[in-house]
Swiss-Prot record:
HAMAP family: EF_Ts. Residues 80-83 are annotated as: Involved in Mg(2+) ion dislocation from EF-Tu. InterPro entries: EF-Ts_dimer_sf, Transl_elong_EFTs/EF1B, Transl_elong_EFTs/EF1B_dimer, Transl_elong_Ts_CS, UBA-like_sf. SUPFAM superfamilies: Elongation factor Ts (EF-Ts), dimerisation domain (SSF54713), UBA-like (SSF46934). The gene is tsf. This is Elongation factor Ts. Keywords: Cytoplasm, Elongation factor, Protein biosynthesis. Its main location: cytoplasm. GO terms for cellular component: cytoplasm. It comes from Paraburkholderia phytofirmans (strain DSM 17436 / LMG 22146 / PsJN) (Burkholderia phytofirmans). Associates with the EF-Tu.GDP complex and induces the exchange of GDP to GTP. It remains bound to the aminoacyl-tRNA.EF-Tu.GTP complex up to the GTP hydrolysis stage on the ribosome. It comes from the Bacteria. GO terms for molecular function: translation elongation factor activity.
Length: 293
């Protein structure tokens, strides 16, 4: 049996980016043969990635990049909040955001195939899955390219905003982006609110108004009033500016001779159903998984 030295473990780790203990195990199994150990480790990391692929990723980060006349916003997901703070995962998310802005991929599949760090985005992702031990995924991205101005705002790593705007004052773009993160409008103007959201709100208003026992014509006015109030609350231009409750966003923009063309808002895990695990069952599952390794 060949002696496994610390330098051998370090060399294998540098080649594969795998955890130290995994490198030592692979070298031991390969009887010190570096090439064989590397092959064994890559197979094992690949198996970890395939096992993790079916697990729900409802945590994660939002990253942004602005360069030249293009900007991006991306959401990458992981399984736990702990991994969402992992430096390797955060670094990967920033690289992905830059690629979206500079390379303009058509969709997530095209993004996954782009070159990154001597490999591809998806290969780097899979290597991270093997290293970290959690399923990681690129969920979505948006890219703006414009001759106007761009501003981005990240609230921690869980909420991200990208805004296209005009005007001489760059603070306007920053303020609008921050406002969007705080108030979460669903559209730029009331005319842009999705029809399904309006229908849902109208249905709720009708049920409430019907319970009032008032005449039909009064009920109709109550419903319409509720819908109009909702439209103002969820459309950016009609919202009260968070930094000045005496102004709407539209009034603030006009005062600064500015305008907003469009925006994107990402909230980590929005719309993803999280898996609820029993704690005892989770511990038992982790113990069982450790025994199989």
């Amino acid at each position: 049996m060949a002696a496994i030295t610390a330098s051998m473990v370090a060399e294998l780790r540098a080649k594969t980016d795998a955890p130290m203990m995994e490198c030592k195990k692979a070298l031991t199994e390969a009887d010190g043969d570096m090439a064989r150990a590397e092959e064994l480790l890559r197979v094992k990391l690949g198996n970890k990635a395939s096992k993790a692929a079916s697990r729900v990723t409802a945590e994660g980060v939002v990253a942004s990049f602005i360069g030249g006349n293009a900007g991006s916003l991306v959401e990458l997901n992981c399984e736990t909040d702990f991994v969402s703070k992992n430096d390797d995962f955060l670094g990967f998310s920033k690289k992905v955001a830059e690629l979206v802005a500079t390379q303009n991929p058509a969709d997530v599949a095209a993004l996954a195939a782009l070159p990154l760090d001597g490999s591809t985005v998806d290969a780097v992702r899979l290597a991270l899955v093997g290293k970290i031990g959690e399923n990681l995924s690129i969920r979505r991205f948006v890219r703006f390219e414009t001759s106007n101005k761009l501003a981005a705002y990240l609230h921690g790593t869980r909420i991200g905003v990208l805004v296209e705007y005009t005007g001489a004052d760059e603070q306007v773009g920053k303020d609008v982006a921050m406002h969007i993160a705080a108030m979460k409008p669903v559209s730029l103007s009331s005319d842009d609110v999705p029809a399904d959201l309006i229908a849902k709100e109208r249905s709720i208003a009708e049920q409430k108004a019907a319970e009032s026992g008032k005449p039909a014509e009064i009920v109709a006015k109550m419903v319409e009033g509720s819908v109009q109030k909702y439209l103002k609350e969820v459309s950016l231009l009609n919202q009260t500016f968070v930094k000045n409750d005496k102004q709407t966003i539209e009034q603030m923009l006009k005062a600064g001779n500015s305008s907003v063309q469009k925006f994107a808002l990402f909230v980590v895990g929005e719309g993803i159903e999280k898996k609820q695990d029993d704690f005892a069952a989770e511990v038992a599952a982790q113990v069982a998984a450790a025994k199989q390794q």
